[in-house]
C-alpha cells in the first residue's frame, strides 16, 4: 500500500512534463526489460503445464482495464489455446472478482455462448484477484478456485479465510 507521503509525491508529478519517448527498444531499455519479463512469465506457465495444455480450447479474456490484460492472452496462446480478447478499455473499469454484479454475469454468459468459449478469464484491475468462468459463463468463486489450484499444485493442506463459504 502507498502512504500519504507517497500519494503526495505521485500527485506532485501530475503537472510535470512527460519524458521524451524515443521508442528505443534496444537491449537494456525499459521496454526491452518488460518484453523480456513477459516472455519469462509466459515461459514459466509453459514449463509447468506444457505448450499444448490449452490446445483446442477457446478462452475468452475479459481485458477491461486490468494491468494483466495482455499477459493473460499471451499465456493462453503460449499454452496452445486460442485467446479471444474481450471488452478492452483505456479507462478504469472497477472489477470486483468476488462480487460480480448481475449485469456483468449476464455479459460473461453471453460472451461464452456467442463466442463458443470453453472458459473465460480475467482479473481485478491490479491483477491480484483472478476470475475464471466455465463454458456457460458461470464464475468459479475464489474460495473454490484457491483449493482447486492448491490441489493442482499438490498441496496437502489449505488454509482459507473464515469468509470462504462456497466450499
Language-model features: locations:
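Short Gly/Thr/Asp-enriched flexible loops that form oxyanion-binding sites at enzyme active sites
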Residues: 1, 72-73, 129-146
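Gly/Ser/Thr-enriched, mixed-charge loops and adjacent short helices
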Residues: 1-113
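Proline/glycine-rich low-complexity loops and linkers
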Residues: 16-36, 136-167
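Solvent-exposed alpha-helices and their adjacent loops that cap or buttress functional pockets
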Residues: 49-54, 111-115, 123-124, 131-133, ...
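Conserved residues at beta->alpha junctions
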Residues: 63, 124, 162
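Flexible loop/turn segments at secondary-structure boundaries
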Residues: 68-69, 128-130, 166-167
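Short glycine-aspartate micro-motif
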Residues: 118-122, 158-159
Amino acid at each position: 500500500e502507498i502512504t500519504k507521503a507517497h500519494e503526495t509525491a505521485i500527485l506532485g508529478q501530475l503537472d510535470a512534463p512527460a519524458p521524451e519517448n524515443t521508442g528505443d527498444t534496444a537491449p537494456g531499455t525499459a521496454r526491452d526489460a518488460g518484453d523480456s519479463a513477459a516472455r519469462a512469465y509466459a515461459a514459466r506457465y509453459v514449463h509447468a503445464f506444457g505448450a499444448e495444455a490449452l490446445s483446442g480450447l477457446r478462452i475468452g479474456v475479459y481485458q477491461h482495464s486490468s494491468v494483466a490484460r495482455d499477459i493473460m492472452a499471451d499465456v493462453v496462446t503460449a499454452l496452445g489455446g486460442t485467446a479471444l480478447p474481450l471488452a478492452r478499455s483505456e479507462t478504469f473499469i472497477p472489477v470486483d472478482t468476488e462480487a460480480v454484479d448481475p449485469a456483468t454475469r449476464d455479459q460473461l454468459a453471453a460472451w461464452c455462448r456467442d463466442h463458443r468459449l470453453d472458459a473465460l478469464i480475467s482479473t481485478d484491475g491490479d491483477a491480484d484477484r483472478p476470475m475464471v468462468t466455465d463454458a456457460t459463463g458461470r464464475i468459479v468463486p475464489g474460495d473454490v478456485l484457491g483449493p482447486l489450484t492448491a490441489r493442482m499444485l499438490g498441496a496437502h493442506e489449505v488454509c482459507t479465510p473464515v469468509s470462504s463459504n462456497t466450499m
